[in-house]
From Swiss-Prot:
Alphabetic keyword roster: Transcription, Transcription regulation
Native source species: Arabidopsis thaliana (Mouse-ear cress)
Annotated Basic and acidic residues bias: 122-143
Positions with biased composition (Acidic residues): 84-108
Protein name: Probable transcription factor At4g00610
Pfam family name, one: GeBP-like_C
InterPro entries: GEBP, GeBP-like_C, GeBP-like_DBD
Amino acid sequence: MVSVQNLKTDQLLNFLFKNPTKFLSRFSPMAKNKTLVTPSTVKKSSDVASTSKKLSGVASPAKKPSGVTSPVKKPLEAVASTSSEEEEEDEPSSDSESGSESESDTEAEPMTLAAAAPSSSNEKRQSEGKPEEERAKTETETGKKPLLFQRLWTDEDEIVFLQGMIKFAKDTGKNVSEDMNGFFEKLKDSISFEVKTDQFVNKIRSMKRKYIENKKTTTEHDKKCYELAEIIWVSDGDATALVKPKKKKLKVDEESDWFERSFVDGAFKELGPGVDEETWKKNWSLVPVKKRKRIEEKVKSMQADELKTTWQKIDVVHEMRSLMAKYV
C-alpha cells in the first residue's frame, strides 16, 4: 500500500480526485488534526500558490521578497518549514538591524567630521580675536588707549631748557650756538630722558618757530615758554646778549664811529678841556638808547644842512669866477 507521505504533490492530487471517499476513510486522523485536504482546498491552495509566484516575481527595492509557503506541502514537514521560515525572517530582521546600525554609524561619522570642521574654524576665529581682546583688556585696565607716538620732551623739560639757555649765556657770556657742546654738557643731566646733541639743536629751532614765528600761546605752559622765548629772542636786553652778541658789538662799533665822526666829540673837547676821549665815550654809552638816537638825528640833520650850505658856497664861488672872467 502506497503511503501518502511518500507521494509527491501531483500524485497526491490525482489520488485525491480519483478516490476521495477512500482518502477520507483512510486518513481520518489527519482530518481530526484539521490537516485534511479536500478538492476545494486544493484548488484554493493552487490559486494561492499561483498568486504567490506572481508576487514573488516582482522584486522589492528595499528588501528581498519573503518566500510564500505553498499550502500543498507534506503534512509532517509543515511545522518544521514554518519554524525555519520564522527563523529566516528573524535573521533578516537582525541583519536589517545590523545594517541599520552600520548605516547609522556611517551617517554618524560625517556628522562628527562636520562638527569638527566648525569647531576648528571657531578656534581659528577665537585665535584671531585674541589680540583684539588683549588690546581691549589693556585699554580697560589702563583707562586709555596706547599712544602711537610718545612725547619725549615734557612740559617741565621745556621750561628747564629755556631757563638753561638764559643762565648759560649769563654765566659764560657766550651764545648757545657758539658753544653747543658746553651747553649740552651743562644741561643734559637736567632733562628727564637720555638726550643727544642733535635733539638740543632741533629743540631750539622748533621752540623758536613755535613761540616767536607762530606765537602759539594756547595753554598756560605755552604762555610761560613764550615769556622765556621773548627774553631769549625778542627783548632788547637779554635777547641781544644771548642770541645776537655779534650784531650788538657791531652796533656799538657803529655808534662809536658815529661818535668819533660827529662834531660832538670836538665840541666836548672844546667845552670840557682836560677830559680825555675815552671818558667821554664811556659816559656817552651810559645814556639811554632812545635819547642817544634823538641826539643822533639832530646831528645828522645839522650835517645835512652844513652840506647844503657848503654846496651853496661852492655855487657862489663859481658864479664869482665866471663874472670875473667875463669882465677882466
